[in-house]
Amino acid sequence: MCHQQLVISWFSLVFLASPLVAIWELKKDVYVVELDWYPDAPGEMVVLTCDTPEEDGITWTLDQSSEVLGSGKTLTIQVKEFGDAGQYTCHKGGEVLSHSLLLLHKKEDGIWSTDILKDQKEPKNKTFLRCEAKNYSGRFTCWWLTTISTDLTFSVKSSRGSSDPQGVTCGAATLSAERVRGDNKEYEYSVECQEDSACPAAEESLPIEVMVDAVHKLKYENYTSSFFIRDIIKPDPPKNLQLKPLKNSRQVEVSWEYPDTWSTPHSYFSLTFCVQVQGKSKREKKDRVFTDKTSATVICRKNASISVRAQDRYYSSSWSEWASVPCS
């Protein structure tokens, strides 16, 4: 009832002045206020309603301060900056009745802020989320980067299609890696998602949508990515590389197997392979062979290595990482 009252009260005061909904519920007792961010911006008027049948003796405070901001069942505030955001609490006689946390979402020059996540710039600028799938099972992993280490939370939602969404279940985002980049530390977060009713052999007609809600202190931002599974396929490297010297020859036969994680049957979900011979020095010329088979014949020079990687045979998605074996 509290949330419904809050939204209705806010509409009655603000909707005539603005055609856009500038406050919305992120989750229980947490609301996002959308602000145009420029000097002397008027901000947004927000009406908070205490979730109680009581009518009298109610006071309001912000965060840990004991300063009384107002009294009565409702509190009207003008939200202009981060100092106006935070947790508003209504009390009566020393008892907490309810609270509402206000977060801010900034828009500057018509563009929503993207301060929390780092632009990965691959495959293009303004790429904040990257996703990969090892096969066509409907399972995929997404990850993002930030230089922020504390007071940070993420939540992830996903669906296939937006007009009639089909279910995709995502787990909790977790910190998966830390790296040092010059004077800064970089943190990688990732999430695993699974399409609920995936059909690996079916042609995709609707893209998968991934939405990440990011909150740092009192700042809210959201990031989205849209893709077909076929576009984010990256197989695991081939496994079980073996060399077989050929009699009276400098050549060897290198063989390998499909990765265990690749979709089956392999006669339908086929891979193509790149075989590379690399000398000890990276400046030496690389010899490469492309094949649809799981073996190839190459010249194996002393101190060289042979590497093999895989790609979907029928769709030009990403190559796998290399699997390698030394020539001697």
Curated annotation (Swiss-Prot):
Residues 1-22 form the signal peptide. Known to be C-mannosylated in the recombinant protein; it is not yet known for sure if the wild-type protein is also modified. The keyword Cell membrane does not apply. It is found in: Secreted. Disulfide bonds join 50-90, 131-142, 170-193, 300-327. Residues 237-328 form the Fibronectin type-III domain. Its main location: secreted. The keyword Kinase does not apply. It is linked to Immunodeficiency 29: A form of Mendelian susceptibility to mycobacterial disease, a rare condition caused by impairment of interferon-gamma mediated immunity. It is characterized by predisposition to illness caused by moderately virulent mycobacterial species, such as Bacillus Calmette-Guerin (BCG) vaccine, environmental non-tuberculous mycobacteria, and by the more virulent Mycobacterium tuberculosis. Psoriasis 11: A common, chronic inflammatory disease of the skin with multifactorial etiology. It is characterized by red, scaly plaques usually found on the scalp, elbows and knees. These lesions are caused by abnormal keratinocyte proliferation and infiltration of inflammatory cells into the dermis and epidermis. This is Interleukin-12 subunit beta. It comes from Homo sapiens (Human). The gene is IL12B.
